[in-house]
Amino acid sequence: SRIQGDMDVVGPRANLILANQNGISVNGANFSNFGSVALTTGALSLRDQQQSEGQVQRYVDVSTNQGRIHIGDEGMAGNLIRLELIARSIQVDGPLTNEFTSSSAHIRMVAGESTASFDTAASPVDNLTPWVYYKPGQAQSNEVAIKVGAGSKVTAGQIQILVTDKGAGVRNEGEMVASAGGFTLSSTGDVVQMG
């Protein structure tokens, strides 16, 4: 999938999960009137879970073991509660910006083999209730799973970088700014900081 230009919700804010197992390329995209956005190269399936009193809760399960997300030099931006990038590998070569000013607003990059479960009941205006739950896979790799290229910049209230493949690493040649919250990096491989 190639995403270029504006993506807008006409009407109330909504959450979006966009999936393509063959890969996703974003270059010059702006997301407007979304609550949370997830881009993933995983395979989707729906799962209904019985709750108390006969209530059924639906989850979108995403199983990721292939594919790459690439953010091009014209970048990606949005005013979002959450931005989730989920792929076997992620490369950022331009500005990646979450403009929402809350300290809980985040960009989370999850690279490697993983399973994610999205709660479809999560409100697109609620930044306190979790939207997605992750479970790492069992894969091993010595590759660079997440690369932030020279001249690129990742900006959000919080930035979370998670590499699930054992031995896979992170290489940052750009700039990362967690402007209002915290910065988290989890990887068992090499972490190279050059920016």
Residue spans of the language-model regions?
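Extracellular and secretory-pathway beta-repeat/beta-biased strand scaffolds
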Residues: 1-195
